């Protein structure tokens, strides 16, 4: 809970491990020690939303991403504001959040191990335009109607432990998070929300977990192994022959594993929607000090990582990817 004292994975990969719960963002935090070995904290944190939703047409299921400004049930939905492209904006998309994320945490140090439990509350907002006459038309600037803001409340609970299995030689670390609208707080960045039938942002239920072992065979050598998983549930609906949401079984995945002209252009074909369902990760590595003295410390590290992505089942199956990654690093710490 103390700033810069976080228990983060020792990986070279700066995005750490799938299943690790963290985010890089500004915050205002207050912490109080209520008793020996017991601390309570609360923070207000910079909000942002990870939206993932698709739309397609039955029976073939071809389509693509549902974008801000799209039409649902004859209404225009806006959940992203795009910068004007000047100064530091450069067309960056900013989600329309109206309140900070709130996190509460309790930390316990009873004498053996360190334990934490936390709660998370989030407020997802978008804007919906209902046209006065007939259905709205995407991209039109002459629509007349009534607009309103819709806010959806998300929440999650989680915890973590750090246990000295063999003091000074072997430690166990683990963490987990479960909730609705909590995907952004996992290293894999699965979605928080998708599109709802009324144009609101509909919560995506999900969970994440990670566990690891850290060994110190001798002074100056750290060896680690971690495994993690993140998963979300489907959330979808249909309006006639138009399909919406996340993980809709009517979406087509038919050509995800087929090379097409789109492949060479860096595009995704209309019959490969492949919404992410689950990410898994296994990694091992080490850090060895090669110099430690009056001028600081030099360490050499290496890491192997296996990452698997699994998509929701659609027309044509549930495609997946398997990535094997090797990292090496030399780091100098002057202090």
What would you call each of these model-derived segments?
Residues 1-65, 96-114, 163, 171-173, ...:
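Outer membrane beta-barrel
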Residues 6, 53-55, 128, 186, ...:
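Short, solvent-exposed loop/turn and secondary-structure capping segments
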Residues 28-32, 104-108, 157-163, 209-215, ...:
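Residues on the lipid-exposed face of transmembrane beta-strands in outer-membrane beta-barrel proteins
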Residues 110-282:
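Detector for outer-membrane/organellar transmembrane beta-barrel domains
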């Amino acid at each position: 809970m103390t700033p810069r004292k976080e228990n983060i994975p020792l990986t070279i990969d700066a995005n750490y491990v799938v299943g690790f719960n963290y985010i890089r963002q500004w915050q205002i935090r207050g912490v109080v020690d209520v008793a020996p070995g017991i601390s309570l904290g609360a923070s207000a944190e910079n909000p942002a939303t990870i939206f993932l939703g698709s739309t397609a047409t039955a029976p073939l299921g071809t389509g693509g991403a549902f974008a801000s400004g799209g039409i649902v049930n004859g209404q225009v939905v806006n959940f992203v504001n795009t910068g004007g492209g000047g100064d530091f904006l450069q067309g960056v998309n900013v989600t329309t959040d109206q309140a900070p994320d709130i996190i509460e945490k309790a930390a316990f140090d009873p004498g053996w191990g360190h334990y934490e439990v936390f709660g998370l509350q989030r407020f997802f907002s978008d804007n919906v335009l209902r046209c006065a006459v007939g259905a709205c038309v995407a991209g039109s600037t002459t629509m007349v109607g009534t607009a309103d803001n819709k806010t959806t409340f998300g929440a999650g609970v989680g915890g973590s432990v750090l246990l000295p299995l063999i003091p000074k030689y072997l430690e166990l670390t683990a963490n987990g998070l479960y909730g609705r609208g909590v995907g952004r707080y996992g290293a894999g960045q699965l979605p928080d929300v998708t599109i709802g039938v009324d144009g609101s942002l509909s919560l995506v239920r999900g969970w994440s977990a990670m566990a690891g072992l850290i060994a110190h065979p001798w002074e100056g050598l750290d060896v680690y192994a971690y495994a993690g998983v993140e998963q979300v549930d489907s959330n979808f609906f249909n309006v006639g022959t138009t399909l919406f949401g996340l993980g809709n079984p009517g979406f087509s995945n038919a050509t995800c594993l087929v090379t097409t002209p789109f492949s060479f252009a860096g595009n995704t074909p209309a019959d490969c929607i492949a919404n992410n369902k689950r990410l898994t990760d296994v990694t091992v590595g080490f850090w060895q000090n090669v110099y430690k003295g009056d001028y600081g410390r030099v360490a050499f590290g290496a890491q192997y990582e296996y990452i698997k992505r699994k998509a929701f089942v659609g027309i044509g199956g549930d495609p997946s990817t398997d990535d094997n990654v090797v990292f090496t690093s030399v780091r100098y710490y002057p202090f």
